[in-house]
């Protein structure tokens, strides 16, 4: 601080700081209550209730910020508080956080409230938390001993099998397990398959996070195995095999598999964390290299993730010298996309005007992005970070990019000193555009990319998402090889679409016409017409028809729509189904033919 006050004399400053913290505490109490409710809904198998809960939790933070801002404006005339008082508000707030269990999240909440009240010229060290003020190192839960951040187990005492069984039963899930002894046998077999002979060191132990991670129809046990100098991550998803009966579905023992389930293309977990920083630190030990911003986001604290990401960006800018450039690939009609080559993200801005045939508005596009934020993304739609008033140094912007910005989004630009301030943008993980991946790839790459593309669209379809624009350029390939959709301006709910077959041509003139001879409503979709846009490359066509010949059959799309209208929620797995115990160790399940969510026979046949 430029002028640290010798005395904190402002009673209003203290009252405002206390009010802001009370609203944050209310927010975090609701956040934790949602995770507790998730356990109850999971135990009941109430999947629609879990979806509703996840949607409501996403909007809860902004609702608390709005309530806090309104109170501060009504009772304290916050917009007209002078600088000295704002400085004291922050210092009082820091004092209130000294024994807090979520100080980093509380600081972010403070920033959110301030940014609604103050002009951005006040976004400096004196008034908001540009850097954290309270350390989260060694922060631990002061709740009863039964609820530490993680529990330690020592298999050397009772043996590994008994320890694994105790790990599962300690979560006290209400429904019974179909055959927990069988499931633990599968876990033991998977460990043996992965690591072979396992020589236990004197410090051999297993650490397990104390709360389950809920998402979709799974509850994940997350932990790590410590053996000498090795730290081995694991995740055990537990699922309902039928109503009211549970089973361990698999155990994931590779770091890359955990990185996928915590990926930016999945919805946020519901997890009860007394000390979120301790959970994030634990997860960093099993996924080293994964940014803390992404981990905070994946556990449902997306505002904290957004805050950390922006700090990461500023830090990267101060330690790099390359320039922002227009993103490679085909330019979009709706979004201007640019990137910093040394930073693995893209920046997307809605253009001021859209050429035909696009018929949409900025507000409609922003609502589409909100739809994706609220929806279950299933590992097939990229999460986005939304920012306002982003200041980038002009010296770091390529001249061609500046010209493009001034041409396409002049209404969103403001020059301020040596910075260009962009009023609104989205930031996403950078991926390889699927069209470039297929264009430049080997035969094996094409096989993988096309198979993944078809799987992605079919999974989105089952999740009630119609992408709208199916072109390959609107999909990307992640570093883990998954195909993910990222162009949302034409996205619709499949249940809002009319799936139609192309009517037979009435005559030869119709047949030769380059235009439809039939009426097309605003929500009509014609799967039979997608072929010319997707199958132009002979290599792609061969692979596509091998794996996804049914893609162009309206019956496939209509069947998914019908199931959705009947309230059916399909099963999704953020890992290859070949890893599921009922598939991988099918012989162990011969005595339980009803296992596997009612789809076991199909999975095993596959």
From Swiss-Prot:
| Gene Ontology biological-process entries | glucose metabolic process; glyoxylate cycle; tricarboxylic acid cycle
Q: What is its EC number?
A: 2.7.11.5, 3.1.3.-
Q: Which GO terms describe its molecular function?
A: [isocitrate dehydrogenase (NADP+)] kinase activity; AMP binding; ATP binding; phosphoprotein phosphatase activity; protein serine/threonine kinase activity
What reaction does this enzyme carry out catalytically?
Answer: L-seryl-[isocitrate dehydrogenase] + ATP = O-phospho-L-seryl-[isocitrate dehydrogenase] + ADP + H(+)
Active site residues according to the UniProt entry: 383
The subcellular localization recorded is:
Cytoplasm
The principal localisation class reads: cytoplasm
**UniProt xrefs under InterPro entries:** AceK_kinase, AceK_regulatory, Isocitrate_DH_AceK
The record's similarity note reads:
Belongs to the AceK family.
Q: Mind telling me what this protein is named?
A: Isocitrate dehydrogenase kinase/phosphatase
Lineage start = Bacteria, Pseudomonadati, Pseudomonadota, Betaproteobacteria, Burkholderiales
Q: Which gene encodes it?
A: aceK
